Every structure is written in structure tokens, then in C-alpha cells.
């Protein structure tokens, strides 16, 4: 399978629609790869993206498109969903009118992962019955709290409850299974998704507290998952401790990129290349492709997901 690096986001947004790099029945598109608030970041006046918008980043989101069925599925509705759907329309145009979304899968109720639902309402797209796949607590949160409850009442969205480790058929060629993971669960569960086609299994896991905690809860460690899966998009919020000035980062759970690479250092190059880092904070230097840290990730045999990337999941 071929993983094709996308063009710069600005170029993508103004370019004509691009055909898949190869004949591909099911294709994954990276629409954003940043942490919830993106970059430039609120309250961070020194971010270079203020002066150079090309250095900005949107919150993490992917789309999976079944080209045979003509169906598109969004994973995460971020605060940047307007720009991200425009990017998707450029890369894989919808067949009909409206947003062209046949379903939205949400991992958890933190702002960068669901706040974009607000644009589906009457003040924005005025969407009609978009299926939104969420875990039970998350479903109750959306149904019982405004403004999300208005989206449900007006049927801009239709809640589709999920169950842990129970696959749902998104389209004829795509099945999606939620896996619960440890994270701050103030308003909802937190899950990662395994996206299964007839040719591959892909893990989308932008947020979790600890690889060790997940392994203890699930009985499966990270290295085993790398062996069993074909592609993994995993939490890269921080590169290493010390990124946040004046903060004790031991109190901020997230696997560090350096730790994840070290954990998997004993795997073969063929296995390590399955892993792609996503959901990086504005302080994480891998957000810059030319940084020494990005070069280190590549040298260690891993990859960094970037907006505009595309990956064939079923040739």
C-alpha cells in the first residue's frame, strides 16, 4: 500500500480536485494533525504561525472514503471542520449536495474532537440527519446538553450509539470498532477506532493517558498491536518532558513521542513504519517538517502525519 504525502494545505485548498494516486477502493485522508486548539495557539503570541499562516495547523481529524460506494466518513468534528471539509472536498469531492458526510465518528468530548458539530446546525450548514457515532455516555451528553441537544432535536444529527469492541458497518467496504482507552473522561468515554477494510486494519488513536495503563486494562501491549495492525495513527501530543514552561509535565498524561519510539525500537523497520504520529501540541517541534525532531522520527523509522496525507486502505 502506498502512503502518499499530500501537498501543502494552502496549495491543496486552491488546486483542482486530485484523483487518487493509484486505483483505490477505500482511502484515508488526514485533514488535520494538531492538538485540540491547533496553531497558532490561543495565548501564545510568539507562535511563528501568526506571522506565517503556512506554519499553522488544524486539530486532528481524518476522513475515510469508500470510493466504490461514494461514501465519506469523518473522524472527529473539530473546531476547524469548515476548512477541513473544504480540504476533503478538494481531495475527494462528494457525489451530491450538502456536506456529503455519511457518518461522523467521535472519540471523546474534548473540544478539539467534537466542537465542530456546532457548524452542522441552523446557524451553519443546516445539516439533515448526519449519523454521529458515539459511546453511550457521550450520546447522553449530546442529547442532554445545549447547544448539542438542539442538533439532535432538529435532526441535524442522528445519534448512533456504539459499544466497546463491537464493530459497526459504516459502508459495504468499511467496518469500525471502538476501543476504550484511559483518558480524562469528564463528559464521555474515550475511544480509539480500528478501521477495517478487506485489505487492512488501521488504528486511529489521537488521545490517551498511558500505553501502560491501556495495556493493563486491555491485556494487549503496544508492540503487539503494531504487529497485528497495518497502520497506526497514535497520540503525539508532546515530544518529551519540558515542553510546557512552568508546568510539571508529570501531571499531564500523554505518551511522549520519544517514549513511544523507544518502546517500539526493538521492532523491525517494516513494523515501525506502520506508526504515524498525530495530535501534536503547538509546542511539539514535530509540527515543523524541517525540525531536528521530525528528522529524528524519520531516522528511527516512524512517520509524522500531516494535513493532506492520503493512504490507500483497500486497493
Positions of predicted regions on the chain:
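Bacterial N-terminal signal peptides that target proteins for export
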Residues: 1-7
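Cleavable N-terminal signal peptides
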Residues: 8-9, 19
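N-terminal signal peptide c-region/cleavage motif recognized by signal peptidases
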Residues: 14-16, 20
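Core dinuclear metal-dependent hydrolase active-site scaffold
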Residues: 22-90, 94-96, 159-225, 309-315
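Active-site neighborhood of phospho(di)ester-bond hydrolases with catalytic His/Asp-centered motifs
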Residues: 74-78, 100-113, 117, 133-135, ...
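Di-metal (Zn2+ and/or Mg2+/Mn2+) metal-binding site signature of metallo-dependent hydrolases
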Residues: 80-126
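A short, active-site helix/loop in glycosyltransferases that binds the activated sugar's phosphate group
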Residues: 137-146
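Cap/insert and terminal regions of metallo-dependent hydrolase folds
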Residues: 199-201, 209-310
Amino acid at each position: 500500500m502506498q502512503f502518499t504525502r499530500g501537498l501543502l494545505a494552502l496549495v491543496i485548498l486552491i488546486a483542482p480536485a486530485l484523483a487518487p494516486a493509484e486505483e483505490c477502493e477505500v482511502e484515508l485522508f488526514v485533514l488535520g494533525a494538531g492538538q485540540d486548539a491547533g496553531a497558532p495557539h490561543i495565548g501564545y503570541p510568539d507562535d511563528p504561525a501568526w506571522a506565517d499562516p503556512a506554519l499553522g495547523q488544524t486539530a486532528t481529524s481524518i476522513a475515510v472514503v469508500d470510493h466504490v460506494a461514494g461514501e465519506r466518513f469523518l473522524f472527529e468534528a473539530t473546531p476547524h471542520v469548515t476548512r477541513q471539509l473544504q480540504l476533503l472536498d478538494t481531495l475527494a469531492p462528494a457525489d451530491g449536495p450538502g456536506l456529503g458526510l455519511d457518518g461522523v465518528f467521535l472519540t471523546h468530548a474534548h473540544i478539539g474532537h467534537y466542537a465542530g458539530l456546532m457548524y452542522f446546525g441552523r446557524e451553519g450548514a443546516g445539516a439533515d440527519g448526519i449519523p454521529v457515532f458515539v459511546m453511550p455516555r457521550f450520546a447522553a451528553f449530546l442529547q442532554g446538553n445545549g447547544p448539542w441537544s438542539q442538533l439532535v432535536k432538529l435532526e441535524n444529527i442522528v445519534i448512533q450509539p456504539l459499544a466497546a469492541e463491537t464493530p459497526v458497518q459504516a459502508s459495504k467496504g468499511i467496518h469500525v470498532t471502538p476501543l476504550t482507552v484511559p483518558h480524562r473522561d469528564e463528559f464521555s468515554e474515550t475511544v480509539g477506532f480500528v478501521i477495517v477494510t478487506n485489505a487492512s486494519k488501521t488504528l486511529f488513536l489521537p488521545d490517551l493517558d498511558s500505553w501502560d495503563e491501556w495495556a493493563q486494562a486491555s491485556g494487549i501491549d503496544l508492540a503487539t498491536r503494531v504487529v497485528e495492525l497495518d497502520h497506526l495513527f497514535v497520540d503525539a501530543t508532546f515530544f518529551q518532558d519540558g515542553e510546557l514552561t512552568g508546568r510539571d509535565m508529570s501531571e499531564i498524561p500523554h505518551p511522549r513521542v520519544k517514549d513511544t519510539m523507544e518502546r517500539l525500537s526493538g521492532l523491525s523497520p517494516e513494523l515501525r513504519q506502520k506508526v504515524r504520529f498525530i495530535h501534536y501540541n503547538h509546542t511539539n517541534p514535530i509540527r515543523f517538517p524541517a525540525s531536528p525532531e521530525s528528522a529524528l522520527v524519520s531516522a528511527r523509522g516512524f512517520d509524522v502525519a500531516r494535513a493532506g496525507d492520503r493512504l490507500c486502505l483497500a486497493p
